[in-house]
């Protein structure tokens, strides 16, 4: 990959400023709007925030992990950083498009790279009805919540909720309940990425529900519609010996 213009993004309040200063000295970085690659230094959260901020530019992102898990990031290797970027492989992520309506009738939309989740706002369990492609699949789910995850996000919140991990090229989505109370033994569903999933919240006055797309939260929701979109693809760069597909496979074996 022939790359000449690279932009650098990092948190100016990071506790790793000494390392960041080393990286800043490696290259004459350009403005973000002029870049062919955007380097994001930090953790998965920092990367996700900046993907949402700059995905409209259609520029590939290369994450350098200075956080904890860093599932979407590359390991820090200051000496080989530029070489690793030039030799990197590309993973294409298609985000989820979420549309929500709140109790006042206001409609909002948001994109999610990892997952869309809905969850109870009070101590009472949420109740909702689930449709897939316009067909009712569950008349009532009583749970703390539910989520729809992309393959890239299937190893995040979805995995913690006992959902399955999806291969990156699977063209599938995870629909996973969060602490399901009724039906107690329902563990979710695997759906084609072309599916449209709708949650209708039941008894919203007594059992209010919030919804999030990654980190964007909306309160007092009456219904949520989720579908994958190919209109806003995100390109992530990974070291050739440390691809996202490899990480997803490794995660399934407890790696």
UniProtKB/Swiss-Prot annotation:
It holds the Pfam family NAD_kinase. The keyword Phosphoprotein does not apply. It is an enzyme of class 2 (transferase). One of its GO terms (molecular function) is NAD binding. It is found in: Cytoplasm. It comes from the Bacteria. The keyword Kinase applies. It catalyses: NAD(+) + ATP = ADP + NADP(+) + H(+). Its main location: cytoplasm. The active site is at residue 44. Its EC number is 2.7.1.23. One of its GO terms (biological process) is NADP biosynthetic process. NAD(+) binds at residues 44-45, 49, 114-115, 144, 152, 155-160, 216. Its cofactor is a divalent metal cation. GO terms for cellular component: cytoplasm. It comes from Rickettsia peacockii (strain Rustic). HAMAP family: NAD_kinase. The lineage of its organism: Bacteria, Pseudomonadati, Pseudomonadota, Alphaproteobacteria, Rickettsiales. Signal peptide: none annotated. Belongs to the NAD kinase family. Involved in the regulation of the intracellular balance of NAD and NADP, and is a key enzyme in the biosynthesis of NADP. Catalyzes specifically the phosphorylation on 2'-hydroxyl of the adenosine moiety of NAD to yield NADP. Keywords: ATP-binding, Cytoplasm, Kinase, NAD, NADP, Nucleotide-binding, Transferase. This is NAD kinase.
